[in-house]
Amino acid sequence: MSQEFLARILEQKAHEVEQMKLEQIQPLRQTYRLAEFLKNHQDRLQVIAEVKKASPSLGDINLDVDIVQQAQTYEENGTVMISVLTDEVFFKGHLNYLREISSQVEIPTLNKDFIIDEKQIIRARNAGATVILLIVAALSEERLKKLYDYATELGLEVLVETHNLAELEVAHRLGAEIIGVNNRNLTTFEVDLQTSVDLAPYFEEGRYYISESAIFTGQDAERLAPYFNGILVGTALMQAENVAQRIKELQIDKG
């Protein structure tokens, strides 16, 4: 994903937001708070499992998947949250996937999308999300803060995604409680787990850190476990022949 490609996505999002109706705020779906769970379960590397049919880098991943069944398998095997892609154009997701999954599971759900506007936040909440994603690279620091504050005022938690030290510092200034480190370089679209390892020395007490992208094996998870509270895994689970077994391999006990 080059910056040009990220710009294309954001341009598409701006167009979608322009057409989007402002929904009335519905009651927040009740489940546990992700940050609280991470705080109280630091003896294991927690898995956030993603429902993702396709991506710009890989193309089609699993178009025929029964999304609800996949999500229920995630929940049954102890994942801490389910991430649901809702971007239609680039990831072949849909808001209805979030709605369907959120109505059939009890654990938190994350709306995985490129959020640039309050209307998207309301829409995510109404569809059952209890956590939203805000990407530092996609927003000015001022806009990021406005959207972060708006989401938290609505009772949502926010996963603030970073890719480098400058963005991590933005997340810290924001006061973000849950911070993601994406191992995908947005300029080259290459992935490298070393991104997460390199940023770990700058982590701060009292925050919870999630490593995202390029995590496929138990060995990958072992490498990240000393530094992170959790990992977000999509492709490896969407392609796994035995999803339950793959989740178990990724849930590293820290003792």
UniProtKB/Swiss-Prot annotation:
<dbReference type="GO" id="GO:0004640">
    <property type="term" value="F:phosphoribosylanthranilate isomerase activity"/>
</dbReference>
<comment type="pathway">
    <text>Amino-acid biosynthesis; L-tryptophan biosynthesis; L-tryptophan from chorismate: step 4/5.</text>
</comment>
<dbReference type="InterPro" id="IPR013785">
    <property type="entry name" value="Aldolase_TIM"/>
</dbReference>
<dbReference type="InterPro" id="IPR013798">
    <property type="entry name" value="Indole-3-glycerol_P_synth_dom"/>
</dbReference>
<keyword id="KW-0456">Lyase</keyword>
<dbReference type="GO" id="GO:0000162">
    <property type="term" value="P:L-tryptophan biosynthetic process"/>
</dbReference>
<protein>
    <recommendedName>
        <fullName>Indole-3-glycerol phosphate synthase</fullName>
        <ecNumber>4.1.1.48</ecNumber>
    </recommendedName>
</protein>
<dbReference type="InterPro" id="IPR001468">
    <property type="entry name" value="Indole-3-GlycerolPSynthase_CS"/>
</dbReference>
<keyword id="KW-0822">Tryptophan biosynthesis</keyword>
<dbReference type="GO" id="GO:0004425">
    <property type="term" value="F:indole-3-glycerol-phosphate synthase activity"/>
</dbReference>
<keyword id="KW-0028">Amino-acid biosynthesis</keyword>
<dbReference type="InterPro" id="IPR045186">
    <property type="entry name" value="Indole-3-glycerol_P_synth"/>
</dbReference>
<dbReference type="InterPro" id="IPR011060">
    <property type="entry name" value="RibuloseP-bd_barrel"/>
</dbReference>
<keyword id="KW-0057">Aromatic amino acid biosynthesis</keyword>
<dbReference type="Pfam" id="PF00218">
    <property type="entry name" value="IGPS"/>
</dbReference>
<keyword id="KW-0210">Decarboxylase</keyword>
<comment type="similarity">
    <text>Belongs to the TrpC family.</text>
</comment>
